[in-house]
Amino acid sequence: MVNSIFYIIMGPPGSGKGTQSQRLANHLGLPHISSGDLFRSAIKSATPLGSKAAEYINKGLLVPDNLVWEIVQETLNKPGCKSGCIIDGFPRTLDQAVLLNDFLVKSNAADYRVIQLDVSAEEIISRIHSRFICPACNYVYNQSQGFKECPTCHVALIRRSDDSLEVIHQRLESYEKATVPVINYYEDLGKLIHIPSETSPDEVFQSILACTEA
């Protein structure tokens, strides 16, 4: 990979990293790799790895590193990612971060950057508990928007099984425990950029663009 562009978008559940990752991918003309979407696709296809991952995701727990890396690496090795990509939802543990760093360095993509979306726990709980998704296109809607079906796909919106209050708290606890070492790792490497993310999605995106274009 020559002159490839890789951005890793990190943040707690409900921080908007999926939305911002897709917007950045569209802006830069790069693929958007969402580990969550990869897992859900594997689960829907009932692959052996997908079935194992489902047991963890539905309980709000982190998927073991060996399952995560095998799924993500397979996608990163595809021709479409040769010029770079936007990675969302990975890595979530220090071991995953080291594996990804080694992979990117060997792929001549050592000049990657990590964007951390900072959001308070109170805001996260409010966001997640009021969100619904389209099962066809995975677009996320807020309850305050008043939609009962996706305006694009005309499919009824649903709440993900891992968006219940109990599971939200479990996910936040799991995220905090596993991800702090990842943040410290990227800070030590000089890769980390903090973006305050409790403003509007448009304002957050402008802050991200300012960092990527600096």
From Swiss-Prot:
Pfam families given in the database record: ADK (PF00406)
Subcellular location per the Swiss-Prot or TrEMBL entry: Cytoplasm
CDD domains in UniProt: ADK (cd01428)
Keywords: ATP-binding, Cytoplasm, Kinase, Metal-binding, Nucleotide biosynthesis, Nucleotide-binding, Transferase, Zinc
Record flagged with keyword Kinase: yes
Entry's Gene Ontology BP terms: AMP salvage
Keyword tRNA-binding among UniProt keywords: no
Entry-linked InterPro entries: Adenyl_kin_sub, Adenylat/UMP-CMP_kin, Adenylat_kinase_CS, P-loop_NTPase
Alphabetized Gene3D superfamilies for the sequence: P-loop containing nucleotide triphosphate hydrolases
Amino acids binding ATP: 14-19, 131, 140-141, 199
Pathway assigned in UniProt: Purine metabolism; AMP biosynthesis via salvage pathway; AMP from ADP: step 1/1
Region (NMP): 34-63
Catalytic activity: AMP + ATP = 2 ADP
Stretch list, region LID: 130-163
Domains (record comment): Consists of three domains, a large central CORE domain and two small peripheral domains, NMPbind and LID, which undergo movements during catalysis. The LID domain closes over the site of phosphoryl transfer upon ATP binding. Assembling and dissambling the active center during each catalytic cycle provides an effective means to prevent ATP hydrolysis. Some bacteria have evolved a zinc-coordinating structure that stabilizes the LID domain.
Subunit record text: Monomer.
Family to which the UniProt record says this protein belongs: Belongs to the adenylate kinase family.
Protein name, per record: Adenylate kinase
The species this protein was found in: Chlamydia caviae (strain ATCC VR-813 / DSM 19441 / 03DC25 / GPIC) (Chlamydophila caviae)
